[in-house]
Amino acid sequence: GLAYDISDDQQDITRGMVDSLFQAPMNDGTHYAVMSSYEYISQGLRVPLILGIWGGKMGINPIMMSAGELESGNAGEPAKMCCLFINDLDAGAGRVPIIVTGNDFSTLYAPLIRIGVCTGIFRLVDTFPGQSIDFFGALR
């Protein structure tokens, strides 16, 4: 029955299989990944901080924070690990603006800033001004 459903709760709600207030039993369904992080924390293991962007039905809200909050207070120590988790990116990327700021993106991934790497992207944007992200994603 639905009480033992281990599929994605959000998908079941979308398909009308369950009421929007339905939550699977503990350790099942979508919320398992969030709840299971307690198992790591309780054992004193170091795990990345996971920031999730989810719908309100899971009771998890996005957290706005500065990268400075992840830095160590002691010079030379590594920063805290973190992960940005976006659920169902393919459905939301064309509807949600993604804004990234930074001082030196070469520290993130050097090949992205090599001369000539993004010229094709800029050429497409110049050729089709004012188009949404979905438009460029559909180009082949």
UniProtKB/Swiss-Prot annotation:
Compartmental location: Plastid, Chloroplast stroma
Keywords attached to this entry: ATP-binding, Chloroplast, Nucleotide-binding, Plastid, Stress response
Disulphide-bridged cysteine pairs: none
GO cellular component terms, semicolon-separated: chloroplast stroma; thylakoid
Main location: plastid
Keyword Zinc-finger appears in the UniProt entry: no
Inducers of expression: By water stress.
Alphabetical list of PANTHER family matching this protein: PTHR32429, RIBULOSE BISPHOSPHATE CARBOXYLASE_OXYGENASE ACTIVASE, CHLOROPLASTIC (PTHR32429:SF32)
Function: Activation of RuBisCO (ribulose-1,5-bisphosphate carboxylase/oxygenase; EC 4.1.1.39) involves the ATP-dependent carboxylation of the epsilon-amino group of lysine leading to a carbamate structure.
Homology family: Belongs to the RuBisCO activase family.
Protein known as: Ribulose bisphosphate carboxylase/oxygenase activase, chloroplastic
Species name: Arachis hypogaea (Peanut)
